[in-house]
Amino acid sequence: MKNKKILIISLCAVLIALGAAGSVMLKKNSISKHSLIYADVNDNLISYKISEKAKTRIFFDGYSEYLLVGKYIGGEYCCVSKGENSLYYDVLLIKNGNIEKTYQLSFCPDEIAATDGDIYCLTNGKIYRLSTADNTESLYKDNVYTHKYRLNMLITDKGDLVYLRQENDGSVSLVLDCDGQETDVFTFNPDDTIAVGLNTDNRFLYKDKSGNYKTMAVSVYGGKQQKYGKSATFVQASSDGKLAVKCKRQVLGECSDVYIVDGKTGIAVSTNLVDLDIPYSVVVV
């Protein structure tokens, strides 16, 4: 009987150990398949493989300058580029490592995000919508708050637009736009609140002076505000929601300290990524 108990205890210990090892392996695998895509200060398009801490340049035929990247619902990412000897800018929609479609722009935006139907371009406090049906540009929003943040226009994983709207009284509203139907999520004083970004389940993160600048979260689709993980000044989530990039500090739009965290729990899984010069426009694929 005693030997039987010892055998059962030993078997349980083995199963627990195997489960822990499997958990570690799963986390390692989920990290290894992700890369950061960004345009560096020399207008090169860079892929940074997280597990290997290695940078490689990405090239597409006919393009020599890569100026900006953004989220693309339906693919991996979108990129603003300039063709060789061209006076215009092109938006490249990238899927499975290749150019899926291209659209022409008359200007280079400050921020960009794309869905299957529309491409949103933010510049000088205005959002222009570029139709993927006929490649026409049209003014969509003209009251976007851009004085303090680099995260003024975001896209949820459902393809809906989220942006910061300037109000007449000086306050700023976080607005959800679903096919032209606007919903105010919440309004804040820009002198007291720091916008952070969208996390992996469509919660908008922010820090408020009244809460000692702890990171808070509110769902853009409705829900209670709540505390969220460790402090950060930027969040960019991967498309599958497993990882997020957080930059602890931002200086002139560039991240001076970058680390990778689990997108669901906020637990750091890779820190102190060296030799990175990542602008605010970074996409996790």
Name the predicted role of every residue range.
Residues 42-48, 85-92, 125-129, 169-175, ...:
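Structural motif
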